Design a protein with these regions (language model features):
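Conserved CoA-thioester-binding segment of acyl-CoA-metabolizing enzymes
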Residues: 1-56, 71
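C-terminal alpha-helix plus adjacent terminal tail
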Residues: 1-8, 42, 56, 162-168, ...
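Terminal peptide-recognition signature
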Residues: 14, 18, 32-33, 51, ...
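Hydrophobic alpha-helical membrane-association signature
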Residues: 29-32, 185, 226
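An acidic, glycine-rich surface segment that forms the CoA-thioester-binding/catalytic face
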Residues: 30-42, 65-102, 134, 149
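Short, active-site-adjacent cap segments at secondary-structure transitions
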Residues: 56-60, 106-107
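Crotonase-fold acyl-CoA enzyme core
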Residues: 89-204, 235-236, 240-241, 248-250
Length: 257
């Protein structure tokens, strides 16, 4: 197995385990990632997910060109996105996702991180979308997510040149949430995930859905979506428990119901 998928309490941990190839994604890895994400999405006991890479050099160096190229050439002309659906494209996951970026995040690796909600970076991490240097463009959401996350001029700089930036520059432009020592990347991601899991899980998913879907809506439509999702949250058992716990001055015991 290339995707090492483990469950730790309320967390789903996804580790790309190809350190000898800088954790590049091949066809097998893409299929395994799809299967793991579907299981994560559908498991009611899992409330948050973390992505990371095996070893110290790379989070994910993108697509394994030698392995993926024949596959892509076969499917792209007829159906550009017959790739296995993941959080990057084709699979909607409203549970929060955190990228623990322990090294290189290049091409599809950066796109995987962009498809997460929170990004924790190692001091040694480097980021880039070098696809244009191969005569290609990012195809796993990079052209769409990057300019939604950072200023358009900085997105253009990365997209048009394929240049790499370090962790501090990524933090400066708002690409990552925080930068930590290499040995603290995964533990920090778990701390953030555990903090998220203290909140009502259905409310967190509703907030994520409102945020993501609202980006493609007018303000008026986004406000209506927010109102609808707030109504949903207020109908849950978790909301009743949360308000009761508040009045009783205790921690709520949320059940994702």
């Amino acid at each position: 197995m290339i995707i090492d998928y483990k469950k730790e309490g309320k967390l789903g941990i996804f580790t790309i385990n190809r350190p000898e190839a800088l954790n590049a994604i091949n066809v097998q890895a893409a299929r395994e990632l799809h299967d793991a994400l579907v299981d994560f999405r559908d498991d009611p006991e899992l409330w948050a997910g973390i992505f990371t890479g095996a070893g110290e050099k790379a989070f994910c160096a993108g697509a394994d060109i030698k392995d993926m190229l024949p596959f892509l050439k076969e499917i792209l002309p007829a159906s550009p996105w017959k790739m296995p659906a993941t959080n990057m494209r084709g699979l909607k996951i409203w549970k929060p996702l955190i990228a623990a970026i322990n090294g290189l995040a290049l091409g599809g690796g950066l796109e995987l991180a962009l498809a997460c909600d929170i990004r924790i970076a190692s001091e040694k991490a480097r980021f880039g979308l070098p696809e244009v240097t191969l005569g290609l463009i990012p195809g796993w959401g990079g052209t769409q997510r990057l300019p939604r996350l950072i200023p358009a001029c900085k997105a253009a700089e990365l997209l048009f040149t394929g240049k790499l930036i370090d962790a501090q520059e990524a933090y400066r432009i708002g690409l990552v949430n925080t930068v930590v020592p290499p040995e603290a990347v995964l533990s920090t991601a778990k701390e953030w995930a555990q903090q998220i899991c203290q909140a009502g899980p259905l409310a967190v998913r509703a907030a994520k859905q409102a945020m993501i879907r609202g980006l493609s809506m007018t303000l008026e439509d986004g406000l209506k979506l927010e109102n609808d999702l707030e109504g949903y949250a207020m109908s849950t058992e978790d909301f009743a428990e949360g308000t009761k716990a508040f009045t009783e001055k205790r921690k709520p015991d949320f059940k994702a119901k």
